[in-house]
Every structure is written in structure tokens, then in C-alpha cells.
Amino acid sequence: MSKLGGKNKKAFADFVNKLKALGADIQQAEVNVVNKATAAAKEVTLDNTPVKTGTLKGRWADIPLIILNGKISKGYTNNLYYAGYVNDGHRTVNKSGETVGYVEGFRMLERGITRGRLAMRPLMDEEIRQIKRKTGF
């Protein structure tokens, strides 16, 4: 996935502070939120991936969750050689190599990343509500 920026970074810091105040397992809560946000992002990416033969759509694979120096990272990837052309668009050429047109990209990955970022705040709020229910606050 992509890095948190701006409002999401501040929201995540507020989320951690609230978890500390509740005495919750912060790392587990962060892992839960990251897993759910990545799943939401991947779902939108899959929905926006065009289906011609199904090969491109079937090649989306999860990148395992990694915790390194207190930072949590998780994502998904598509290693099919033409995935970038479908996502970003590409030029079309004639037999002599001249550009004769351009095929717009589907931007499925960007749509998924946007969905993942937008899902962060509600997921953090839901995680705090669940912890409050468990701890009796």
C-alpha cells in the first residue's frame, strides 16, 4: 500500500493516543486496522480490474504483513507483465513504429489506494469502539 500522509497520519497518531488511554494492545489494534484497510483497498482494485480472460484479475496477490522498527506494512501486487499498461494506459503504434493513438488506463490500483486511505478513519473509530466494549469503558 502507500504511505500515510497528511490527515491520515494525524488521525493514526490520535488513534494510538486513544488506545494508550484505554490501556489496549496498541500493536494488535494497528495490525487489525491495517489488515482491514488493505482488504478494502484490494476489493476496490479487484472490482476495477477489467476481465477479458481473467488472468490479470486473478494475479493480484497479498504482500504479507511486516512489522519492522515499529512500523507496519502490508499491501498487494500484480506481477503480470502487462498490468502496468492496463493500469496506466499505453500508446498504440503502427507497423512502422509511429504512434497512432493512446489507450487510457483503468487506474484500478489508484482507486484501491484511495479507498484504503478513506477507510482508515472509520476503521480506527470502529477498533476503538470494540476495545471500549471489551474493556467496559
Predicted regions and their residues:
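Short, Lys/Arg-rich flexible segments
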Residues: 1-83, 90-137
